[in-house]
């Protein structure tokens, strides 16, 4: 049995168990219920093919979702991440898979045209941003468009939900919401990474 004694021993036990479980699944046809991410890996993901949202145990705890944090921080971090992932269901990629997981463009030509009209300015706006690690380089707004849409939409959805839940939130709590969101994706890029 696993215990606190040996990390290597615990990894071997877990790996053996995982292999045994994989062998049992062969031929059972339950692949649609699988998600190949370990619970200890912080991940929140929308499965486009099966129209479902997954959250691992690791993402359901601090720093993303901390029950000791104020509601503003929970909405700003976890709520915005959920909104980000759900946006993928109806975004530029999501319109090629319907609610039953069938491939096909379910948008009308008018919807597709309106989407392009509404997302064009967002692409242009992001193209004007420079990388902090390499100010001479600009973001490729067309290349990052899907993620930018999901980020902006996720924050808007979480903000609307927070305002509905806490209509009289203080200025400090409103700021806490946005600080929590900015903390979710914080990272420092080297000039080499920024140029990739």
Predicted regions and their residues:
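Intrinsically disordered, low-complexity linker/terminal regions across diverse proteins
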Residues: 1-196
């Amino acid at each position: 049995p696993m215990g606190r004694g040996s990390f290597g021993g615990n990894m071997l036990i877990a790996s053996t168990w995982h292999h045994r479980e994989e062998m049992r699944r062969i031929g059972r046809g339950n692949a649609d219920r699988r998600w190949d991410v370990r619970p200890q890996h912080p991940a929140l993901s929308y499965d486009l093919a099966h129209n479902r949202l997954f959250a691992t145990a690791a993402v359901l705890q601090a720093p993303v979702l901390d029950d000791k944090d104020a509601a503003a921080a929970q909405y700003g971090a976890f709520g915005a991440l959920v909104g980000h992932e759900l946006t993928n269901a109806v975004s530029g990629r999501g319109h090629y898979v319907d609610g039953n997981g069938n491939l096909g463009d379910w948008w009308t030509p008018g919807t597709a045209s309106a989407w392009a009209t509404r997302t064009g300015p967002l692409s242009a706006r992001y193209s004007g941003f420079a990388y902090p690690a390499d100010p001479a380089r600009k973001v490729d707004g067309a290349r990052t468009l899907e993620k930018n849409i999901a980020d902006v939409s996720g924050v808007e959805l979480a903000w609307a939900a927070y305002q509905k839940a806490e209509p009289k939130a203080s200025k400090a709590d409103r700021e806490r919401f946005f600080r929590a969101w900015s903390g979710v994706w914080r990272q420092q890029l080297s000039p080499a990474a920024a140029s990739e």
